[in-house]
């Protein structure tokens, strides 16, 4: 057994002198491996009387356990040293700035809507909204649009059934507002509208904004002044503007507004007019006492003119190369 004690001492000394995990594993194999010094001690048990073998085996196992514990402790120490060394090499400078997050941006049509809302809110206009699934009364009848009008045709309007449709204009919001509120009324109504059309300058869904004023003594002069101020504010230049006579069932007189483009050609930007007396009567407002004006414009159309976009469909394709230009 004195030889066993020497082996344990040698093993512990070898363990302490190991400088890395690989060297430590070599010590383990040398003393505890299949042919290790301590493992081979078990073969000497056959030379002992049967009654002495259990006690001798226990002593050998105890020696192996001591060496194994020494191996485990040394391995933990070496791994800790290695970890600390690696962490020291991987030190993070917390004073460095973090990774830059790419900022998003508003869609160009959203920019246009917010810009227009901001302008008209300064003039006392409130923002009004309404349902996109509309009935034929609010979308057509109340607006003085007769049954034979082309806008009611299936090829222009998305109908659900005989009376329900996807609104073709936000004018229904004006009707609902006038039904629920007595003059004076001053609103703008932005929102999505739907028409059965798709090409370079038309999409089945687009954004429209309409404006409405109803009060006493409202004249066409008020309409012209308001739209002159708006267009010059929106395009940020002293534009040449003209009002061209037109026809809309819900206004009388009616006009379309053009601005002079950089190429010397007139560009249509919106439609407008004085609210038709029939429309006022349909919502219970006396046209002998009150008058008003209304205007409507496509948000995509104005956005195209402001930013020089040539294809309306680009606004709906979610191409980041296009959208990032407006950040």
From Swiss-Prot:
Can you tell me which residues bind Mg(2+)? 252
Lineage, uppermost ranks: Bacteria, Pseudomonadati, Pseudomonadota, Gammaproteobacteria, Enterobacterales
For this protein, the Enzyme Commission number is 6.1.1.20
Protein's name in the database: Phenylalanine--tRNA ligase alpha subunit
Q: Does the keyword Metal-binding apply?
A: yes
Where is it mostly found?
cytoplasm
Q: Which PROSITE patterns match?
A: AA_TRNA_LIGASE_II (PS50862)
Annotated family = Belongs to the class-II aminoacyl-tRNA synthetase family. Phe-tRNA synthetase alpha subunit type 1 subfamily.
Q: Which organism is it from?
A: Edwardsiella ictaluri (strain 93-146)
Entry-linked CDD domains: PheRS_alpha_core
Entries under InterPro entries matching the protein: aa-tRNA-synth_II, aa-tRNA-synth_II/BPL/LPL, Phe-tRNA-synth_IIc_asu, Phe-tRNA_ligase_II_N, Phe_tRNA_ligase_alpha1_bac, Phenylalanyl-tRNA_Synthase, tRNA-bd_arm
Signal peptide per UniProt: none
Tell me the cofactors it needs.
Mg(2+)
A GO MF term: phenylalanine-tRNA ligase activity
Description of how the protein assembles with itself and partners? Tetramer of two alpha and two beta subunits.
Classification via Pfam families: Phe_tRNA-synt_N, tRNA-synt_2d
How the cofactor is bound: the record states:
Binds 2 magnesium ions per tetramer.
Its annotated compartments are: Cytoplasm
GO cellular component annotations, sorted alphabetically? cytoplasm
Q: Which UniProt keywords apply?
A: Aminoacyl-tRNA synthetase, ATP-binding, Cytoplasm, Ligase, Magnesium, Metal-binding, Nucleotide-binding, Protein biosynthesis
What general EC class does the enzyme of this chain belong to?
Answer: ligase
What is the catalytic activity of this protein? tRNA(Phe) + L-phenylalanine + ATP = L-phenylalanyl-tRNA(Phe) + AMP + diphosphate + H(+)
Biological process terms in GO annotation: phenylalanyl-tRNA aminoacylation
């Amino acid at each position: 057994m004195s030889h066993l004690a020497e082996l344990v001492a040698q093993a512990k000394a070898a363990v302490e002198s190991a400088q890395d995990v690989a060297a430590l594993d070599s010590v383990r194999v040398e003393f505890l491996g299949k042919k290790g010094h301590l493992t081979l001690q078990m073969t000497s048990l056959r030379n002992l009387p049967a009654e002495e073998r259990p006690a001798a085996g226990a002593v050998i196992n105890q020696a192996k356990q001591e060496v194994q514990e020494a191996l485990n402790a040394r391995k933990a120490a070496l791994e800790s040293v290695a970890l600390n060394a690696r962490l020291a090499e991987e030190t993070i400078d917390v004073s460095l700035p973090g990774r830059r997050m790419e900022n998003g941006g508003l869609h160009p049509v959203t920019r246009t809507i917010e810009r227009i809302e901001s302008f008209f809110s300064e003039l006392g206009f409130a923002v009004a909204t309404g349902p996109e699934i509309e009935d034929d009364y609010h979308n057509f009848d109340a607006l003085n649009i007769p049954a034979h009008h082309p806008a009611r045709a299936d090829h222009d309007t998305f109908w659900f059934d005989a009376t329900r449709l996807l609104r073709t204009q936000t004018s229904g919001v004006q009707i609902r507002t006038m039904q629920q509120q007595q003059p004076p009324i001053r609103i703008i109504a932005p929102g999505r509208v739907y028409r059965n059309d798709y090409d370079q300058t038309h999409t089945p869904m687009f954004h429209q904004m309409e404006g409405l004023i109803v009060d006493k003594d409202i004249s066409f002069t008020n309409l012209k002044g308001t739209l002159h101020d708006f267009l010059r504010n929106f395009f940020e230049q002293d534009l040449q503007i003209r009002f061209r006579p037109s026809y809309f069932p819900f206004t009388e007189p009616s006009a379309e507004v053009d601005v002079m483009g950089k190429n010397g050609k007139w560009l249509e930007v919106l439609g407008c007019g004085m609210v038709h007396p029939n429309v006022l009567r349909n919502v219970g407002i006396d046209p002998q006492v009150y008058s008003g004006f209304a205007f409507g414009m496509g948000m995509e159309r104005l956005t195209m003119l402001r930013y020089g976009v040539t294809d309306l469909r680009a606004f709906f394709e979610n191409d980041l190369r296009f959208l990032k230009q407006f950040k």
